[in-house]
Design a protein with these regions (language model features):
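Sec-dependent N-terminal signal peptides
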Residues: 1-3
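Beta-strand-rich, non-transmembrane domain signature
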Residues: 7-168
């Protein structure tokens, strides 16, 4: 697993992510390893009203189990197959949300399942907006200890903590 970090947003941006929680839980289902993913994102308009589109990707081997957003907006589902590709089952789920004034907040959450771990190779740290706080959690049970995480391109500002609970 590779984890990448991207830069570009600043705390002066109008829309910021005040908190993001992104968890990945390794499990076995009928003897096959899968990864359950839950992502919860809180947004805030810091200067004026603005539109935003929280989104997540899914497809044949990554199911979208639930999507929700506070503050209005209905989930939309679209195919994102690139041109000149014979077959690609890539899809996106997104919300069209509007924060109507400074200080307005909203939240979005997505639940996905990676049914084939060949498609669980990267976790991106960056988001579309400046991130005030983000926590990634990976839970790997002892029965799946053959899976390992590899951090790549971490800046000194990123803190990585590993722990083993009583279950191993």
């Amino acid at each position: 697993l590779y984890v990448y970090n991207l830069y570009g947003q600043t705390p002066d941006d109008n829309i910021i992510i005040t908190k993001c929680s992104d968890s990945y839980i390794f499990e076995e289902k009928d003897g096959i390893p899968i990864v359950s993913n839950r992502k919860e994102i809180s947004y805030e308009a810091t200067r004026m009203g603005a539109s935003l589109q929280p989104h997540t990707y899914y497809g044949e081997f990554i199911s979208l189990d639930k999507a929700s957003a506070k503050g209005g907006g209905k989930a939309e589902y679209k195919s994102i197959t690139p041109e000149n590709v014979f077959f690609d089952d890539s899809k996106v789920c997104f919300f069209n949300l509007y924060l109507d004034r400074k200080g307005k907040k909203t939240e979005a959450s997505f639940k996905r399942t990676f049914h084939d771990l060949h498609y669980f190779t990267r976790v991106y740290l960056g988001e579309d907006y400046f991130i005030r706080e983000k926590q990634l959690t990976f839970i790997i049970p002892q029965s799946l200890s053959r899976f390992h995480l590899t951090e790549k391109n971490f800046s000194p500002a990123i803190h990585c903590e590993r722990s083993i609970n009583s279950a191993g």
